[in-house]
Each structure stands twice: as structure tokens, then as C-alpha cells.
Amino acid sequence: MFRFGSGKRGRHEIVMTEGPLLPRILAFSGPLILTGILQLLYNAADVIVVGNYAGHEALAAVSSTGSLINLLVNVFMGLGVGASVAIARNYGARDVKAMRKAEHTAMTLALFMGIAVGAFGFAMARPLLRMMDSPPDVIDGAALYVRIYFLGMPANMLYNFGAAVMRAVGDTKRPMVYLMISGLVNVLLNLLLVIVFHMDVAGVAIATVASQVVSMVLVLLCLFRTRGVTQLNLRECRIDRRSLREIIRIGLPAGLQGSLFSVSNVLIQSSVNSFGSLVVAGNGVASNIEGFVYTAMNAQHQACMTFASQNYGAGKPDRVKRTLWCCLGVVTAIGLGMGLLIWLFGKPLMGLYNPEEQVIANGMIRMAVIMPTYFLCGLMDVMVGQLRGVGYSIMPMIVSLTGACLLRIVWILTVFAQAHDLTVLYLSYPVSWFVTFAIHFLCYMLIAQKKINQLKPV
């Protein structure tokens, strides 16, 4: 029978409900940052190999698929957020039975969703890319990439849900190691398939899917072999209705929010597509570089959500509130520091991906708007993490969809439609981040804090 010992945790787990808060948040988020940066380095290797050995059309084909993939995947990945919150809260409350039911429900759900999403994405790739007005010289390669990518969706889902289980109990180091291994597989296959066998877009997609399978196998082996409350058991893999309701209550709004965010990003990508393949390539490279800042900031979002959830389950209101302020401070420092540094060295960084001067110039237009203001995105995400961590799901979804998604769409249909200028298009990002953060902060101070103050120790 699984049980918590006398306050002892596994050697890979971080105790979130006791001890100094900031060092433990940094210990939790540090491996997440390294994991995300490693993943982006491997993704960057994809883009660098394609950009230098297959030309800007192949680069545009790979770069232009991100918003479509996110649109199809985010609603289901949001359920992974719900699973992480449910597991973390039960872990903080030391309710082993409920925690294990949530874990096995989540992993069963991941398998079914991976198969369903993979089939849909494979079948609908080309029609959806047509709806996005993909340039004629890009759409064939983009459709091929999306189809191959979605063949690996079951592995992608199982890895992400398995990693969410591990993060919920404070284990962020082992997923980092597994990603290092799978990422190395990705890079080696990229070099082999693109440079040696000249498979271009197909080679990049196959390498990506292969690396996802490797990471899935490593995470599943870890969960099956671990000794403790998170051990995975095939005989327990079933859908528990109560756990499913809790996962859906938190995760579905998060997933809908992510997908509807992607709707606005698809609209932005469609607007970028109207400028031609050189602008699409520059936008894709700049976006790829921005990802290094985003992944570091997103680690604070995950830390805030997990720490708030565990301490909420443990009935510790002061630690819940201090979690927010620690994460807001850290994410501001990361966003401003990394954003300004990358903007300063933007041209040589862009040149690593593609040497064409016009591609670099187009990418720098995006960087000049996004990089100095990117910390606002981090502040917005930390507020969302705090609200989800204490059990609010509908509120952050409505605020985010209104303040970010809807505002961006209105901006594109009005301000950008009048100017048809890249800088004006990109300004929709910082404006929406600031408005959404401000509304989230007001909701937290006026509504959520009352709920937190009523907590009683478990």
C-alpha cells in the first residue's frame, strides 16, 4: 500500500509546503528552465539545419506550422495542466488515494487523446493550412511536416502528461535528463536525414517524432519503476469519474484558453503570410529565438501554479500568497534581462539561422517590438498560474480570452487593417499582455485573496 512516510519525500522531490520559499522555487524552476532551453536548442537545430541546407522556402514551411499545431494541441495539453493541479493539491493534502486516481486517469486520458488528435491533425493538415493562406511555395512542405508531426501525437501526449505528474510532486530534474537524451537523438537524426539524405522538411519532422518517442519511453519507464506514491501501474489505468471531473474543471478552461490564444496567433500568422515567404521566414526565426525567453518565464508560471496548489492543499495561506510575489519578481528579472540581451545581439543570432539579409531584417522588426516588452507576458502568465493553483479556472480563461485573444483579433481587424505594417501587427502582443495582466491582478486582489485567507491547516 502506498503512503506518505513521516514527512519524507523521494530524493527527486522538492518539499514545497515547508522551509524557505524563494530558494525552493528557484530549485524547482531551474531544471524547468534548462529543460525548456534544451528543447529550444534542439528545435533551433532543426531550423538552423533546414535554413542553411534546404533554403528559405523549407525554413518557412517548418516555421509556419507552429501556430496551427498549437491550435490543435493546446486544448488537450490544457488537461495536462488540470492533472498537474489535481495531483499537486492531493499531494499537498497527503491524500494518496485521490492522487493516484488522478495520475492514472490522466495517463489513460493522454493515450486516448493522443490517438484522436493525431488522426485529426493528419487528415486536416492541408485544408487548415489553406485556410491560413499559406504561400503557394510553402504549403506542400508545411502540410508534409504537419502530417508526420501528428503521427507522433500519442507519444507527445504521454510524455507531457507523464512529465506533468513528475512536476506535480516537485521532480523537475529527471524530465530534464530525458529531454537531453531525446534532444540528442533529434539533432543527430536532423543532421543525418537533412544533410546526408537530403530529406529536407520530411527529415526534420521524422527526427522530431523519433525524439518524442524516446522521451515518452524514458518517462514511462521512470513512472513504472519508481518506488513511491507516483508509481504507475497498468492495472490502475482507468478513468475515475471524480478525478476526470476535477481534471476537466481546471484543465478544459486552460486548454480552451490556449487554443483560442492560438486562434489569434493563427490570425497573426495569416497576416504575416500576406507579406511573402521572406517575411514568414524572418518572423519564424525571431519567434524561435523569443522562445528562449518565454520558456524561462514559463517555468515561473509552472512554479507558481504548483507551489500555490500544494500549499493550498496543505492549508497554508501565507505561503500561497508569498509564492505569487516571489514568482512575479523572478519573472520580471528574467524577462527584462534576457529580452534586452537578445534584442542587443539580435542580428548575429538571426544570422545563425539563415544568412539572407532580408530574412534577418524582417526578423529584427519583430524583435524590436517583442523583446523589450516580453516581461509583460511573463507577469500575465504568473498571475494565471496563481489563479489556477488556488482552484480558479473559468476566471483566468475569460480574462485571458477577453484581454488577449479578443483584443488581438480586434487590433488586427481594425488598427492593422488600416496600416498593414509589420510593426503595427506586432504591437498587438505587448498591448494585450499589459491589459490582461492588469485585469488578472485586480481579480486576484479583489476576489481570490478572500478565498485564500479562509484556508485552514490540514
Predicted features and spans:
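Short alpha-helical transmembrane segments in multi-pass integral membrane proteins
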Residues: 1-29, 87-152, 196-252, 308-373, ...
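Residue-level signal for short hydrophobic patches within transmembrane helices
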Residues: 18, 22-41, 45, 68-75, ...
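Transmembrane helical elements of multi-pass membrane transporters/channels
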Residues: 27-46, 148, 159, 182, ...
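Transmembrane alpha-helix boundary and packing residues in multipass membrane permease domains
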Residues: 32, 36, 48, 85, ...
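Helix-terminus/linker motif at the lipid-water interface of multi-pass membrane proteins
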Residues: 37, 41-60, 129-136, 192-199, ...
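Small-residue-rich hydrophobic transmembrane alpha-helices
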Residues: 59-119, 156-175, 269, 282-346, ...
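Hydrophobic transmembrane alpha-helices of multi-pass small-molecule transporters
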Residues: 71-74, 186-190, 216-220, 292-295, ...
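Short runs within selected transmembrane alpha-helices of multi-pass transporters and secretion channels
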Residues: 80, 148-167, 175-186, 204-219, ...
